[in-house]
Amino acid sequence: MECQRCPASARNPATVESRKEKFCDECFIKFVSTKQRKQMMKDEYFRNLFKVIYPFEKEGSVSKILLPLSLSDSGSLVMLDIVHDLLLEQTKQHNNRTGFTVDVLTVFTEENVSVIKERMESLINEKMSQLNKISNIFNVHFIDVNEFFNNASEVSTFIIDNENFEIFSKSKSVDDSNILTLKEILGKYCLNNSSRSDLISIIKTQLIKHFAYENGYNAIMWGHSMTKLSEVIISLVVKGKGSQIATFLDSESFDTLNNKPCKYKNLYPMKDLLSVEIESFLQIRNLAQFLINVEETNVKPNCLIARKSLPSLGQQKLVKNMTINEITNKYFQDIQNDYSNIISTVSRTADKLTQPKSSMAKPSQCQICQSKIYTNPSNWLNRITVTSPYPVETTEEKYLFKQWQDSKLGQSHTHYVELLNEIKQGASNSLDVEDGDVKLCYGCLILLNTSIKDKNLVWPKVDTMDITANATNNNKELSQILDQFEINSDGEE
């Protein structure tokens, strides 16, 4: 088989087959890179961010771009590789000048800090040091996921009244004796893997957006492929957060954080690429060596002709043990080679969605996920749900009720009622219609009601958070990492 994009007089052997077209390695790399660069030049705002602007002395001629890098995600790594090549081209064409600088941000946990340290050393030496010998183009930042809790001066305890779905909250100050951790939140409050996955995703996204807001970036480049975006879109619908889709995909408006306007826009440069194409690019460019889950990455589906691979049966989870995100991921991974049109249909349809009309008296944002709230979820649930139990009457019913009270489930309910009454005493009802202060969106309300122990959750107050400009300085070990791998204009380590 021959590449269909090479000149007819010198066709190379085909190594990749995607979208019913055959590519050699060189043509496929160009195909993927062109798709990403096209999105980076999608409108005037982004064109001005990424192109070299003359004169160089003009204020704002060099843009600041934040690139969240997950070393367990192929998309963000491939995106960084293509951005690196673009910057290298600009330095050659414009006398060592570039139109933008890139700050790479990695959010880590205690469990993976050592392997991230090792992989980042290799990545910095191979992909960033060369350009930083010319100019200070790349900067690297690390944030401990627990900074989400450490940097809040206040936390709120949210609880749902299961009789009418009203939400009550109680705030308290944070000091060194009662700082929360991710491990504590996931272990103490979450009842299943789906709720753990949701909270981790919310925390990481908020850390990245706070970092961008506080450090004045012009754009955040997310490494979501078309497949990944479709997974997120369907997951949002399933979780009751479909109203967030339009905002999530919005690359035309400046973002908002805690009802405050931001100076950056969100960009998805990989949105025209399937995840199998990204995995194939990763293998061709030998980038898997930088990921912390190399073995898992090597068995992911791709569109390489000679090296197609599928997960073995031993690696597959039972559906009942999978999170919502994992179920949607499995579905789209299974169909993308043969039915990629389904994925593109989901993505294109979502792009056409607009934000719902709000029925709120004033703009409100969810205190957990920071999404916009368009209607009062508690009122709607109260209208369609019967929560009053049937009264206990017969001797048998009284006996069974007593057994239930003595069970773990009954004791848990008793603890929930006591906690609800305690919070109610000093808390104002969040559903005051005139005040319009609705604290949770529908999706987070359902999460709290069904997947969180005792229907209550302690969460940092976003308006009291302060993710510092140099987050790594808050952690001694990672400060040492940055010192060791510091990349500067002289190219010295």
Swiss-Prot record:
InterPro entries: CTU2, Rossmann-like_a/b/a_fold. GO terms for molecular function: nucleotidyltransferase activity; sulfurtransferase activity; tRNA binding. Pfam families: CTU2. One of its GO terms (cellular component) is cytosol. The keyword Aminoacyl-tRNA synthetase does not apply. Pathway: tRNA modification; 5-methoxycarbonylmethyl-2-thiouridine-tRNA biosynthesis. One of its GO terms (biological process) is tRNA thio-modification. The modification Phosphoserine is found at residue 489. Keywords: Cytoplasm, Phosphoprotein, tRNA processing. It is found in: Cytoplasm. Plays a central role in 2-thiolation of mcm(5)S(2)U at tRNA wobble positions of tRNA(Lys), tRNA(Glu) and tRNA(Gln). May act by forming a heterodimer with NCS6 that ligates sulfur from thiocarboxylated URM1 onto the uridine of tRNAs at wobble position. Prior mcm(5) tRNA modification by the elongator complex is required for 2-thiolation. May also be involved in protein urmylation. Belongs to the CTU2/NCS2 family. Interacts with NCS6 and URM1. May act by forming a heterodimer with NCS6. This is Cytoplasmic tRNA 2-thiolation protein 2.
